[in-house]
């Protein structure tokens, strides 16, 4: 994954993690997972609900916060 992709991805996922925002993660096969982001790295997201699941990023289509979040893409890019 290029560094450019992580300029948006990392700050967004980190905001969701730090603020304990519930998320719905849709996989490329259509499956919907729900929980809180516990951790993430370049390749995986740890999603916690009743159990912790390791979800590979290449399998993720969409991450949808369960409530509004104050995230500005331009600020995330400017800070890096």
Curated annotation (Swiss-Prot):
One Pfam family here: Hfq
Domain Sm, chain residue ranges per copy: 10-69
Keyword RNA-binding (UniProt): yes
Domain of life of the native organism: Bacteria
Entry's Gene Ontology BP terms: regulation of DNA-templated transcription; regulation of RNA stability; regulation of translation, ncRNA-mediated
GO molecular function, one term: RNA binding
Keyword Transcription among UniProt keywords: no
SS bond partners: none
PANTHER family the UniProt entry points to: RNA-BINDING PROTEIN HFQ
Subunit composition and interactions: Homohexamer.
NCBIfam families cross-referenced by the UniProt entry: Hfq (TIGR02383), PRK00395.1 (NF001602)
Job of this protein: RNA chaperone that binds small regulatory RNA (sRNAs) and mRNAs to facilitate mRNA translational regulation in response to envelope stress, environmental stress and changes in metabolite concentrations. Also binds with high specificity to tRNAs.
Family: Belongs to the Hfq family.
Name recorded for this polypeptide: RNA-binding protein Hfq
Organism: Leptothrix cholodnii (strain ATCC 51168 / LMG 8142 / SP-6)
Classification lineage: Bacteria, Pseudomonadati, Pseudomonadota, Betaproteobacteria, Burkholderiales
């Amino acid at each position: 994954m290029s560094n450019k992709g992580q300029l948006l991805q990392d700050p967004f996922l980190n905001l969701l993690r730090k603020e304990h925002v519930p998320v719905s993660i849709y996989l490329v096969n259509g499956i919907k997972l729900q929980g809180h982001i516990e951790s993430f790295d370049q390749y995986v997201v740890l999603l916690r609900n009743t159990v912790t699941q390791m979800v590979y990023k290449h399998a993720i289509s969409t991450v949808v916060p369960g409530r509004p979040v104050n995230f500005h893409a331009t600020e995330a890019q400017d800070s890096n």
